[in-house]
């Protein structure tokens, strides 16, 4: 039924459009003993053309559970036992499935479970206690008398959900940021935001080692675009031979420590330059050099 209806609809619609255009192409005005023909310029029918726009759809959670959202956006939770336990208690099975990523956890949480949590007095009490600890922690600011510290590293091992590290150096750098936060040191860190991060290894059916990469969805990570007072995405740039390399700036909250991550994978760059922030320690020597220059 629908296939017949649709086909007939398209035929009728086409005839209607043809008749409409033929009527608007020429108009005759009676002027005494003759008819004056006025030609009109056919205008483009823009109303029948799709207009594509990018949009982000974010799942909202009940107002009573908003503290969970704020906690998920700051990596303070990952080295605070009470906060980790809080997220696990939201849905223990789902917590494991999303690799202990609280942002992904809240995104996949069902409305039924949200309603249950809103009516769970013990859970709400636990959440309020953790959130109070967090807000008190964040309210303490570094002394203005202390020197500011700028920390640069190719990798930061902060949590497994943020794949911008490979091993020892990254874990050490991540621990520096966490310790700086706990000691209330005025530190600002800078690194690169890798689209694919570092490879993981697996064995093929023949027993050979294979490297696999998985693209990160930046909007499912504890990072946010840095914007200026006009709402524009803050960028930085570096001169390269015959061109300019651009990088967008993202911000990751590591407790009280701000970590700024540079991302070259967007339309302003040539394809070869977009690959600068594809892989940690990936690509040829020239790409490695570009990474160092950008940082």
Label every model-predicted segment.
Residues 1-3:
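A short, well-ordered alpha-helix in the C-terminal region of glycosyltransferases
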Residues 6-295:
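Catalytic cores of carbohydrate-active enzymes across secretory and cytosolic contexts
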């Amino acid at each position: 039924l629908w296939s017949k209806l649709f086909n007939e609809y398209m035929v009728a619609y086409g005839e209607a459009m043809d008749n409409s255009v033929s009527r608007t192409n020429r108009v005759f005005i009676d002027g005494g003993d003759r008819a004056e023909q006025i030609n009109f310029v056919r205008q483009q029918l823009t109303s029948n053309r799709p207009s594509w726009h990018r949009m982000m759809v974010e799942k909202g959670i009940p107002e009573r559970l908003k503290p969970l959202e704020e906690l998920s956006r700051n990596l303070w939770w990952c080295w605070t036992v009470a906060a980790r336990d809080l997220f696990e208690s939201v849905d223990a099975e789902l917590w494991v499935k999303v690799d202990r990523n609280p942002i992904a956890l809240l995104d996949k949480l069902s409305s039924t479970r949200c309603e249950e949590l809103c009516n769970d007095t013990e859970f709400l009490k636990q959440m309020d206690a953790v959130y109070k600890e967090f807000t008190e922690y964040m309210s303490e600011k570094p002394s203005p008398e202390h020197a500011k510290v700028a920390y640069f590293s190719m990798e930061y091992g902060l949590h497994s959900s943020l794949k911008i590290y490979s091993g020892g150096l990254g874990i050490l750098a991540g621990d520096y940021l966490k310790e700086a936060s706990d000691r209330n040191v005025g530190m600002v860190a800078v690194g690169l935001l890798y689209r694919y991060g570092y490879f993981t290894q697996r064995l093929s059916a023949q027993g050979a080692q294979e490297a696999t990469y998985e693209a990160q969805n930046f909007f499912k990570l504890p990072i946010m675009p840095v914007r200026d007072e006009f709402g524009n995405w803050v960028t930085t740039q570096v001169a390269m031979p015959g061109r300019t390399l651009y990088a967008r700036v993202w911000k990751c909250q590591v407790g009280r420590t701000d970590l700024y991550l540079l991302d070259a994978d967007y339309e302003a760059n040539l394809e070869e330059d977009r690959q600068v922030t594809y892989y940690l320690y990936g690509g040829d020597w020239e790409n490695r050099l570009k990474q160092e220059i950008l940082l």
